[in-house]
Amino acid sequence: MSEVVKKFMYLNRKAPYGTIYAWEALEVVLIGAAFDQDVCVLFLDDGVYQLTRGQDTKGIGMKNFSPTYRTLGDYEVRRIYVDRDSLEARGLTQDDLVEIAFEDMETEEEFDNIVEVIDSARVSELMNESDAVFSF
């Protein structure tokens, strides 16, 4: 009997700190990947701040978990998207975001940055292709 692989999309809409949504979303993404599900992560609205470089949480007394995002590729989370309109509305560009890289262990091919900035039409396509969409 073969295992059923579901396509899970995780929408990250909240700022990285101030609530537990961003941290919990990251945990759920890693759990989905650990169970070999087809995981897609989309950052939109204030969620785009989760991927910004140089986060410093000393002043707010919270643990900075942003370095964990850079390891997503190593956990076989290879479909990572950022909504272009959300970036532009916040005065950000892809250059402001962390790079998520990984090495394919089978082919030894290296991928420098798998974060893809997409438009709203592509966001809709990805949602329609997903078996389940979780919003945080």
Curated annotation (Swiss-Prot):
It comes from the Bacteria. InterPro entries: DsrEFH-like, Sulphur_relay_DsrE/F-like, Sulphur_relay_TusC/DsrF. SUPFAM superfamilies: DsrEFH-like. It holds the Pfam family DsrE. Belongs to the DsrF/TusC family. Not known. Could be involved in the oxidation of intracellular sulfur. This is Intracellular sulfur oxidation protein DsrF.
